[in-house]
């Protein structure tokens, strides 16, 4: 089964909790705090494995949860950090955050790694909070929660050359005679429903990867037929080989087919028309092919080369393969998803990221004030509410952030209910 798109859930490990402990040894009076820090949780890491070809494994396992870090221990011993959860993906996988639309990683090289969900750090033990004013603190932190994400994986095949054209124009036959690939070939439309890759030897020592892609029909850019399944895989190709049935054996007009395919490529809006395109006039062994080719050439620009071939009789193939190899030598890779091209590989690209507010206040119909925000929620989850000292520290942190003052400005009075995540408390003015 060829699977090229799937949605999964990933959750990095939480950090271990810090510990409140004191050194208690004979002949060591007033030993002081000795609570260790919690260990770091495990990241969720994607690694490219060149042995994989599809995303089919993710159809049966869609939830990936990494391990948590161990809690801190007494005698100032830190908790053990968890080992990263390594998930193998095929070459050409793009990882996209479903909720934000952000492209997290584009994984193309064997062994390439990307952290998809970042683990939480371990909470600090009470030894970390010792000060001259408070040499024996009874507070610690909980571990930081690990990042969780809903992500979409898209597989876009890695090929130098993509064969495009209407169904049954001979794309699969062409790939089968110029490479060792054995795509399914039959006398009906959409025989090819998944991409087929083949390594092609140009005959002069040069070689390249060619992809036979599912046939295209009008409206594919809007998802008609195999639509986006086809166009997704052509995004990585550097050269497009446009195969046309020059015999018109199914009553089609070659020039109209040529224009229709190019229109779909342009409508997909991924700079596909900027890629070099080589026109292949296939089925030249059929009746009317020569006459149709002459008429076709009168309707296109004179500087556009057309390579007449017959994939069945294997004529005209050497000239075509050499032309493709020549074009590849002068064609750079095209960026995906409108990623900015960098002129210098050593250039560092800084992106502006809008800073989120520390907290936001909303009010529900029942009068409850609701606090939200990444920073304030993080402080809340890392607070150990079993210790009075930790609760007092959390209250001081809220006051320093300006939460108390902001609530007053929103009309909060003594005794009003304030909710943060699943926890409710009374506002004290």
Swiss-Prot record:
Domain Obg: 1-158
Record GO terms (molecular function): GTP binding; GTPase activity; magnesium ion binding
Gene Ontology biological process terms in this record: ribosome biogenesis
Domain OBG-type G: 159-329
Subunit text: Monomer.
Keyword GTP-binding included in the entry's annotation: yes
Enzyme class per UniProt: hydrolase
Residue stretches in coiled coil: none
EC number(s) given by UniProt: 3.6.5.-
Gene: obg
Species assigned in the record: Listeria innocua serovar 6a (strain ATCC BAA-680 / CLIP 11262)
The protein's name: GTPase Obg
Cofactor or coenzyme needed: Mg(2+)
